[in-house]
From Swiss-Prot:
Catalysed reaction, written as an equation: tRNA(Gly) + glycine + ATP = glycyl-tRNA(Gly) + AMP + diphosphate
Gene3D superfamilies in the cross-refs: Anticodon-binding domain (3.40.50.800), Bira Bifunctional Protein, Domain 2 (3.30.930.10)
UniProt KW Transport keyword: no
Gene it is expressed from: glyQS
Signal peptide: none
Primary subcellular site in the record, as a coarse category: cytoplasm
Database matches in InterPro entries: aa-tRNA-synt_IIb, aa-tRNA-synth_II, aa-tRNA-synth_II/BPL/LPL, Anticodon-bd, Anticodon-bd_dom_sf, Gly-tRNA_synthase/POLG2, Gly_tRNA_ligase_bac, GlyRS-like_core
Positions annotated to bind substrate: 100, 174, 221-225, 330-334
Stated name of the protein: Glycine--tRNA ligase
Length: 462
C-alpha cells in the first residue's frame, strides 16, 4: 500500500538525504537557486550519462559538442532572442508584486481543474481576460494591475573593463545556437552526411519573471539538446521518430507511463518557423509540466545565421550534388526538470504491515546514486567489508555503511534509492558469499563474492 506523494515530502527528503540544498544557505539563500548535494550530483550525472549514451554514444547519426556560454552578440540577433525572447509582465498596483500574465491566467484555469495553455495570446487578449474574470493578485487579492509589457529574459553583462553598448554580451538562454553556428565545422570534420545530429549538454540562463516549483523552473539550468538535420520533406517522419525515441528513453529508465503524456501544440501555440511541436509532459504534484520539447524548426535557424553572418550554412549531397539548407528537428530536454521528475516518480511511501512502513526511491539502477551498499553485519567485520568495498568501487559507485542496525541501514538506503544492499556476515568468512537484498522486493539471496561484479553489471544495464 502506498500513500499520496507531495512536493513538501520530496523537498524534505531531498534536503535531509543530500540530494538538493538551497543555494547560498548560510547567507540566507538566494531565491530560486539550488545546489546538488553528494547524492543529487550523482543522480543528475547519471541522468546526463543515460542521455549521452542513447542520443550520442549509441547513435549512428549523432555526434557531440560543447560550445561556449558566451557568444558573439550577433548570434542572438540572428536567433531572434534580442528582439523577441520575452515574457508578458505585469505588476500589482497595490503590493507591487510582479507576475507573468500568462501564468496568472493558466493558474486561474487550473483552480477550476482545467488545463489551458495561453501561448499565442496577445497582450490585449490576456488583459481583457484578466479583467473579465476579475482575476486577483495572488499576494494581496487586489484587482488592479499595470498594463502588460514584454520583458526580455536574457541576462546581460559586459566583456572587458568598459561597460558600454560596444562591450555588451549575454549569458546564453539556450544551448541550441552554439550547435547551429558550428553546423559547418562539425559536418566537415566529422564527415557527416544528412541525416545527422549534433548534441550537447550545458548550462543556460533565463531571467525568469516568476521562477518556482523547486528545481522545475530556475534562472540557471542545464539542458540536454539535440539538433538533428535532415532533408526538407523528410522532417515530419524524423519528427515522429524522435518523439517516440524520447518517450521510450523515459520509459526504459522506469518512468511510469501514467506519469507522462505527449501534447501536440495547437496552431496558435506554434512558433512561426515550426512545422510541428510536441511536448512530453510529466505529472508533478503541482500539475503537468513540460520536460521535453520536440520541435520541427524547419530551416529557420541555419537561414538566419547565413543571413547575419554571410557564411553559407548549406549542405551539398555528395551523390546528387544537390545543394539545400537542411531542416532541423530539435528534442530539447531540461536536465534539472527530468532529474526532478525521476525523483518524484520514484518516490513511494509503503505500508509494509500494521507496524512497519518505509520511504523508498524506486529509481532505475542506472540512475541510482549508489549501485550498491556494503554493510558489515558488525564492526568486527570492517576490514573484510572494506576490502569488498574497494574491489567493487573500482567499477561501480558503492557506499560503505557500518552505522546502526542492519534494519536501519536498509531503510536508509531504501530512502536514497540504492538498489542492492550487500551484507558481509560471519558466514561470508566460511563460504565467501554475501547476502544481497533487493530494494524493491526486499527479498534476499546469497551471491558469491566472485560473481558480484557480473551480478551488478547485469542489474544496472540500460
Amino acid at each position: 500500500m502506498t500513500t499520496a506523494k507531495s512536493m513538501e515530502k520530496i523537498v524534505a527528503l531531498a534536503k535531509s538525504r543530500g540530494f538538493i540544498f538551497p543555494g547560498s544557505e548560510i547567507y540566507g539563500g538566494l531565491a530560486n537557486t539550488w545546489d546538488y548535494g553528494p547524492l543529487g550530483v550523482e543522480l543528475k550525472n547519471n541522468v546526463k550519462k543515460a542521455w549521452w549514451k542513447k542520443f550520442i554514444q549509441q547513435s549512428p547519426y549523432n555526434v557531440g559538442l560543447d560550445s561556449a556560454i558566451l557568444m558573439n552578440p550577433t548570434t542572438w540577433e540572428a536567433s531572434g532572442h534580442i528582439g523577441g525572447f520575452s515574457d508578458p509582465l505585469m505588476d500589482c498596483k497595490k503590493c507591487r508584486a510582479r507576475f507573468r500574465a500568462d501564468k496568472l491566467i493558466e493558474d486561474h484555469f487550473a483552480k477550476d481543474g482545467e488545463d489551458t495553455i495561453v501561448d499565442g495570446w496577445s497582450n490585449e487578449q490576456m488583459a481583457s481576460f484578466i479583467d473579465e474574470k476579475a482575476i486577483v493578485c495572488p499576494e494581496c487579492d487586489a484587482k488592479e494591475f499595470t498594463d502588460i509589457r514584454q520583458f526580455n529574459l536574457m541576462f546581460k553583462t559586459h566583456q572587458g573593463v568598459n561597460e558600454d553598448t560596444s562591450t555588451e554580451i549575454f549569458l546564453r538562454p539556450e544551448t541550441a545556437q552554439g550547435i547551429f553556428v558550428n553546423f559547418k565545422n562539425v559536418q566537415r570534420t566529422a564527415r557527416k552526411k544528412i541525416p545527422f545530429g549534433i548534441g550537447q549538454i550545458g548550462k543556460s540562463f533565463r531571467n525568469e519573471i516568476t521562477p518556482g516549483n523547486y528545481t522545475f523552473r530556475t534562472r540557471e539550468f542545464e539542458q540536454m539538446e539535440l539538433e538533428f538535420f535532415c532533408k526538407p520533406g523528410d522532417d515530419l517522419e524524423w519528427f515522429d521518430y524522435w518523439s517516440n525515441f524520447c518517450k521510450k528513453w523515459l520509459l526504459d529508465l522506469s518512468m511510469k507511463e501514467t506519469s507522462i503524456r505527449l501534447r501536440a501544440h495547437t496552431e496558435e501555440e506554434l512558433s512561426h518557423y515550426s512545422n510541428a511541436t510536441t511536448d512530453i509532459e510529466f505529472k508533478f504534484p503541482f500539475g503537468w509540466g513540460e520536460l521535453w520539447g520536440i520541435a520541427d524548426r524547419t530551416d529557420f535557424d541555419l537561414k538566419q545565421h547565413t543571413e547575419h553572418s554571410g557564411v553559407q550554412l548549406i549542405y551539398q549531397d555528395p551523390v546528387t550534388n544537390e545543394k539545400y539548407v537542411p531542416y532541423c528537428i530539435e528534442p530539447s530536454l531540461g536536465a534539472d526538470r527530468v532529474t526532478l521528475a525521476f525523483l518524484v516518480d520514484a518516490y513511494e511511501e509503503e505500508q509494509i504491515d500494521e507496524k512497519d512502513s518505509r520511504i523508498v526511491l524506486k529509481l532505475h539502477p542506472a540512475l541510482a546514486p549508489f549501485k550498491a551498499a556494503v554493510l558489515p553485519l558488525t564492526k568486527k567485520l570492517k576490514e573484510q567489508s572494506l576490502e569488498l568495498f574497494e574491489k567493487l568501487s573500482d567499477k561501480f559507485m558503492i557506499d560503505y555503511d557500518d552505522a546502526g542496525s542492519i534494519g536501519k541501514r536498509y531503510r536508509r538506503h531504501d530512502e536514497i534509492g540504492t538498489p542492492y544492499c550487500i551484507t558481509y556476515d560471519f558466514d561470508t568468512l566460511e563460504d565467501n558469499c554475501v547476502t544481497v537484498r533487493d530494494r524493491d522486493t526486499m527479498e534476499q539471496q546469497r551471491v558469491a563474492i566472485d560473481e558480484l561484479e557480473v551480478f551488478l553489471e547485469e542489474k544496472i544495464k540500460f
